[in-house]
Amino acid sequence: MKTMKTLLSASLALTALSGCQPETEKPNILFLLVDDMQSDAIAALGNKNVYTPNIDGLIAEGVTFTRTYTNGALCGALSMPSRAMLMTGRGVFEVQSDGMKIPECMVTLPEQLRANGYQTFATGKWHSDHASFNRSFAAGENIFFGGMHPYEKNGHCSPRLHHYDKTGQYKETSFIGEEFSSKMFADAAIEFLSTAAKAQKPFMAFVSFTSPHDPRNQLPDYGKKYKAKDIILPTNFLPQHPFDNGELAIRDEQILPPPRTGEQLQEELALYYGMVSEVDEQIGRVLNALDATGERERTVIVFASDNGLAMGQNGLLGKQSLYEHSVGVPMLIIDPRSKKHGFKTDALCYLYDLYPTLCDIAGIEIPASVTGVSLKPLLEGTTDKLRDDIFLAYSNQQRALIKDDYKYIIYNVEGKITEQLFNLKK
């Protein structure tokens, strides 16, 4: 009888443990998103100008997707549709109002994770509506609703942020931050991580930096600083774009009106790389906080940018084009259960493919509204290719197709057709 009771007690204990196991088996997700970062603005990917030790460490630890693209945009504010695509797993023609609003019929990635037992948290930039933010996240802090910090209001140094509002109204929750934006977002993430690890639920922390997006005129007192004279200009630098692409008068291009000299671009790049290095330092703080929780080995880490940016390449200074520097984005995934470390794949993919990929990794259902493709087979090494080509669109004037090593771009500006063909291997 005593043996029977002992076995029964052990059985009940195992049953109790197995009852809470499905949630704890799901990996945590730390999603680090930056703003306007070129896909090659990383030392570990060959950029000799910039210092990015923390992002370099992530590249050494995970799988880097070197041919990742945002699908484009139908408006000048690329980050709005790009982030909406990322959150809905849908393409540029499939999001609503250029991403300004995410309707309830489009289940967001954090919303799906939340419905499957995740505690969801966000800090930083949300370039969509309040309602979709609150559907997605059960908690948040130092939240930035909008596109960029205004130059005339002290930019990143005095960001207008919000505390989390359970009502979703955000009418009396705003305040002016007293530290650099990236530090405030990292601080909020660190505070969340310190408590999330104690809960009996997996977490998804979305840390959405607004750097290195301009304003670049004021750098914080941390992070590496650069001398303009030491900056190596991109090999495809031009003083101005060779023809009218339909967007040469947009705000981004007027930050430093063309024609631009090499010396002017060196000054701009010194500031830009200063922003890249400062956000890299804050990413390091977040990673250190994750390590301190003991959850690193149970956490999938994603690093990406919403879109790229021209910094003198092809005579441009914005992102309103379909060149590699504007629509190509850095992206990597670290799954601690994987044996692939420091692996790079040149398989074609979209940024919004992250949505089904993370669902797949977490073992949860991919909503029917998602049209992206899971990259998990690439992570597992069961295939080296998922897409045959990439289609890109900007406004109603530019379209592009990438297939194999070639990119074709066509422009229609007031009826004038211009075509370009690039060998991307050269």
Predicted regions and their residues:
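Formylglycine-dependent sulfatase
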Residues: 2-3, 7-12, 20-419, 424
